Amino acid sequence: MQSKIQKDSPLLTQEEMYLFNCGEFYYSYRKFGAHFLEHKGRWGTYFAVWAPQARQVSVVGDFNGWCGMNHSLQKWEEQGIWTLFIPGLPTGEIYKYEILTSSGESVLKADPYAFFSEVRPHTASVIYSLEDYSWGDQAWLAQRKTRNPKVLPLSSYEIHLGSWRRTEDGRFLNYAQLVTVLIPYVKSLGYTHIEILPLMEHPYDGSWGYQITGFYACTSRYGTPHDLMYLIDQCHQAGIGVILDWVPGHFCMDAHGLGKFDGSPLYEREVHEQWGTYKFDYSRSEVRSFLISNAVFWLDVFHVDGLRVDGVSSMLYLDYGKAKGAWQPNRYGGRENLEAVGFIKQLNATLHGLYPDALLIAEEATDWQGVTGPLDQEGLGFTFKWNMGWMNDTLRYIGLDFPERRSFHQLLTFPMMYAYAESYILPLSHDEVVHGKKSLLDKMPGDYGQKFAGLRGLTTYFMTSPGKKLLFMGGEIPQFIEWREDRELDWFLMDYEMHRKYHGFVQQLNGLYLREKALWEIDGDWTGFEWIDVHNHEQGVIVFCRKGKSFQDRLVVLINFQPYNYERYRIGVEMAKGYREILNTDSTDFGGWGMTNPGLLKVEGVPWHGREFSLEIRVPALGAMILKPELA
């Protein structure tokens, strides 16, 4: 940012070049790229780019007729960095780097550090100043410093901005327009955070933002960087945190992007055959400076509250997505990518040092040990990890026909064997409602009513199981069709009673989650969870207790995964004056058939489930209920 650039020198210093070449210049975006600033009494734009193998680098754009003869950059030979100050060149101008490679080929490249880009399909960078936004989220940031996310509720609404809602003629809502509709909607549903699919500039809509060309440029599809600042600022002022998906594992192969930037493999190590992208080369210090600075950039400049790091498994393993014999083991003969491991640890150490209150979330799908373990204990240092095992087992189970479920009861119970091995987030994400996997509602067996009942049960299981929560947009309506990135959600479904009632159910359940300490106060170890009935595969019922620090905060959760009513179902409980049903998914308010348990439920001295006391309740088909003790 301009003020910080001018603090010492407006231009790159020798010390900063040294840090960059060592992989430790964590604010490289303040000097690399295009910066409108004052130098020697004149305003203009300063350019800096890393291209060590280039024979010549020029800046070209409309301002010089796309001819770089008069605007060649000076090379700092030892550092491989090229710089140039062009007096009088203002913000808003489009530009690219014209790079003459060692083989004599001339290529046009977008600026790796550009803050803004043309709207696709155009690919030029835009000179843009990130100054002059007045933030109003000071109270939010101050409060964030005092909070421990591991012992507080965290419920994220995952969203793809381009397909959440559109204008009547099918155009994207821009960042500023989303403020008036997205924030009240998320707030009304009771979510604590939104998690946004990648906003970094990308050429192809169908990549959902995961194949990036401009890591420092929020996509111009939805407006300007200042518009995005406004959206995040307003989220914070409304009490909503913002997490961004971040993709340091690979980048797209489009000609204007990072690939073969100076004619040589500069940012990339190899092709990711499975995804058709380039993998980053973590052995290069300058690539580490680029990527770690990028993470810092989003936390620093845009005030985001956390980063969800995409594709960590693909980074950690040398054989990821490769056939047998198509990869080389590391120096110890193993499959671990030691350079990627080193990068991740350096990344998390840096971010924890600069922003100790930021959330660092790993999408990691293997049994790698210590993903959320402390760095000083050989862990990777993430705050949370997506629990892909829980997600896979749960969605496999609920997709089974009712009779089959009896033989696969362990899919419900086995995830608790490792529920506290890491600090987990339970993800019902975008990846699970595309590519023929069906929507959450359509995964359910049974008729129309049973599908809704089953989904209410699943959602209750999701919200009451140990771990933080993430639900992809559309799951709260709920949609029958899969997510499609080229159109908005099926909002018309809210005209139908069952969808409207399910939407209200999600709202009520989120509110209960926020209120009930047992669901998050002891979310990180076994003292916060206890099985009551774990083996009832025949009836398809599980019963467990979630615990807070106080007995009066305890909750008893029962979920019936079979389409049968049980009129007198006995469960073992701790002694209390009685238990009150604080949620029943079969309530007619939620679209159920009304088989509930009103009033105070009497505790009896009948031993059951290894406890001295028990009570009887009515259990509805495919129903779930939450009971809370009342003291004498």
Swiss-Prot record:
Q: Which reaction does it catalyse?
A: Transfers a segment of a (1->4)-alpha-D-glucan chain to a primary hydroxy group in a similar glucan chain
Show the active-site residues: 310 (nucleophile), 363 (proton donor)
State one molecular function term (GO). Answer: 1,4-alpha-glucan branching enzyme activity
InterPro entries linked to this entry: A-amylase/branching_C (IPR006048), Branching_enzy (IPR037439), GlgB (IPR006407), GlgB_N_E_set_prok (IPR044143), Glyco_hydro_13_cat_dom (IPR006047), Glyco_hydro_13_N (IPR004193), Glyco_hydro_b (IPR013780), Glycoside_hydrolase_SF (IPR017853)
Enzyme class at the top of the EC tree: transferase
Keywords, A to Z? Answer: Carbohydrate metabolism, Glycogen biosynthesis, Glycogen metabolism, Glycosyltransferase, Transferase
Asked whether the keyword DNA-binding is assigned, the reply is no
The keyword Nucleotide-binding belongs to this UniProt entry's keyword annotation: no
Protein's GO biological process:
glycogen biosynthetic process
Q: What is its EC number?
A: 2.4.1.18
Where is it found, in Gene Ontology cellular component terms? cytosol
Membrane-traversing stretches? none
Pathway in which the depicted protein is active? Glycan biosynthesis; glycogen biosynthesis
User: What function is annotated for this protein?
Assistant: Catalyzes the formation of the alpha-1,6-glucosidic linkages in glycogen by scission of a 1,4-alpha-linked oligosaccharide from growing alpha-1,4-glucan chains and the subsequent attachment of the oligosaccharide to the alpha-1,6 position.
Q: Which family does it belong to?
A: Belongs to the glycosyl hydrolase 13 family. GlgB subfamily.
Q: How does it assemble?
A: Monomer.
Specify the protein name: 1,4-alpha-glucan branching enzyme GlgB
Source organism (scientific name): Desulfitobacterium hafniense (strain Y51)
Q: What is the lineage of its organism?
A: Bacteria, Bacillati, Bacillota, Clostridia, Eubacteriales
User: Which gene produces this protein?
Assistant: glgB
